């Protein structure tokens, strides 16, 4: 190395460093020494990628050096985050480098042989897949297609979810595949489909800068979507007329910005929503022209139960459970009469929210001069009537015509980076196919079979086991070979003690978990497969505003870790068609005889038609190199053919590597910001102004839906409500964020947030250890009475990121009967001193 020379500019830098270091109490020699280094030693390669965390869809710039991610920063060219990152985003460079990163397949063994009660032992990929294939074939032989299943993720890349759905629905001929988005977004999907006949929001993030009012329903955006919250905050503080209303069952950081803050009793949001609709009607503020031209009215089925096991008393007495999604036609007058019982005065009594605040909230919606954006997340969706909540907030926007235009938008925010792009759009749910198609519709199945080049009748016509039902079927021994990818359901799933863990350890079952780290779920499995993360593979995510984003592989995965996509496709080689399809199906397409599932599904002349030389020069692509063709482009273009031409259009593959994402539908190279509005959405017919084209009549549905009580409420034995959720420092189960030292130290363990008066009454002090116990289980946690979250009396809040405090041992596995999404926000507990 040549002797470093210091010029005048560098000398000034050194002097400045010395002054700054002295002020901070830092040793100046070490600080200054880092400023003079050869250029070659500091050169970094920068590239764009979508953030690995929430559904906001921030773009980040990623720096790599020596095959390692060494830095990240917010992408200043990105429309979504405009150069900003949240606290988690700032530490993205560290998520892949935890000390316990998995690098080899691990199989439970005793004496060199697989043993469900054995110790995890490193094995080769060949041995791992050989044992796994044997167990899947045994399950198929024993129970047919219903004996195998998969639990996937809203963190799958688009092509991973597509390949997985294809493998199970077409290859194994089972719809027993579901994403963990069932726990977070299923009610939003069902709400959109019921109201509009098509999924995903009408608006986009640009609404933030155009609106006059924000209403947050069960959404702590300040912590869960902090980058969007910065945009909301900027709009509120820079435009004095703008108002912010926040509704929640406890006070949180989003209340700091609220002009109208409302803490309501759990489940009474249903009552408040109907009361607002009644206020709009009774004060004469219905947009009659809009309602007449663009809506019809429906009365929904009532008494629909709580998605519990059929033998549960609540299910037995639910008269409408078997037809939960049904609805009948009614008139506007009948709807108006229905909601007339829901007055703001009654809503105040029911909810505990002061009447003047409910009136202020209702006026934001009713005033025709006020543009309104409604945001919601898990407070609505993780709800035994979550679909109804979605429908009811759409009612309000439709009654006033405040929809599908800049600043007027009902908007469900997503929690995972590709809950929209992969779970919803690809259709990895147990009842869905790509582009809003469903397995119960013969025309949809026929189209999928045509695109996938399958014989008629390949795809089953009944929905498979959804997330909660998968756990029940595993426990009952009816689902015997099970593959989990990119989620931690033993920590995340409800009622884990009684319904989830027993199925994992059922001796009749073989459980495979693909993960980058030894999560709670991985450690309960029989086989662990080490997985490539984030920029260790080429990827694509779709965010909450319909924005699809791509990134290149930037570094290699450690050891023998492989991507979920590689695992899915490589595993498919272990099955001949004769292993999985009946003879009568094979006879319809004799040319598949003797071929593997890999040949039929992925080497089918479509997925494999793009050669390796189409990969952009300068980037690695481990999966494509392994299979001999550009896998990602082939899968994407085949998948995109489902949606092009009917409102789900995606741009050509290459466009996404050039852009910071595009919002679909993308027609003739132009993205769509506001759907259903003439002049913005290319699918709206000229002269209609607004067209909700998800339904043949072009009209949205306004639903009459009542208040119904929760599945479980506090009583003398369990006197507190329990609500669970997240904190800004950690993401979901903490598998990644708890391995980042700075984030771990910032919030090292979950606590039980409690009202000070409740604590005092129980003779508890801040920091005391307590049991949080329900009828299903308990955890131990320390009491927090002065934290950021401030529950009202009678409610406690416990985050679920901490694997040492598995709060989902306590929660109830009740679901919305329509969406089958779990309610993590309402169950009854008691608090006991340890």
UniProtKB/Swiss-Prot annotation:
It is found in: Periplasm. Its EC number is 1.9.6.1. It holds the Pfam family Molydop_binding. It catalyses: 2 Fe(II)-[cytochrome] + nitrate + 2 H(+) = 2 Fe(III)-[cytochrome] + nitrite + H2O. InterPro entries: Asp_de-COase-like_dom_sf, CT_Nitrate-R-NapA-like, MoPterin_dinucl-bd_dom, Mopterin_OxRdtase, Mopterin_OxRdtase_4Fe-4S_dom, MopterinOxRdtase_cofactor_BS, Periplasm_NO3_reductase_lsu, Prok_molybdopt-oxidoreductase. [4Fe-4S] cluster binds at residues 51, 54, 58, 86. The keyword Kinase does not apply. One of its GO terms (biological process) is nitrate assimilation. The keyword Nucleus does not apply. Residues 44-100 form the 4Fe-4S Mo/W bis-MGD-type domain. GO terms for cellular component: membrane; nitrate reductase complex; periplasmic space. One of its GO terms (molecular function) is iron ion binding. Substrate binds at residue 800. Mo-bis(molybdopterin guanine dinucleotide) binds at residues 88, 155, 180, 184, 217-224, 248-252, 267-269, 378, 382, 488, 514-515, 537, 564, 724-733, 808, 825. Transmembrane segments: none annotated. HAMAP family: Nitrate_reduct_NapA. Catalytic subunit of the periplasmic nitrate reductase complex NapAB. Receives electrons from NapB and catalyzes the reduction of nitrate to nitrite. Component of the periplasmic nitrate reductase NapAB complex composed of NapA and NapB. This is Periplasmic nitrate reductase. The lineage of its organism: Bacteria, Pseudomonadati, Pseudomonadota, Alphaproteobacteria, Hyphomicrobiales.
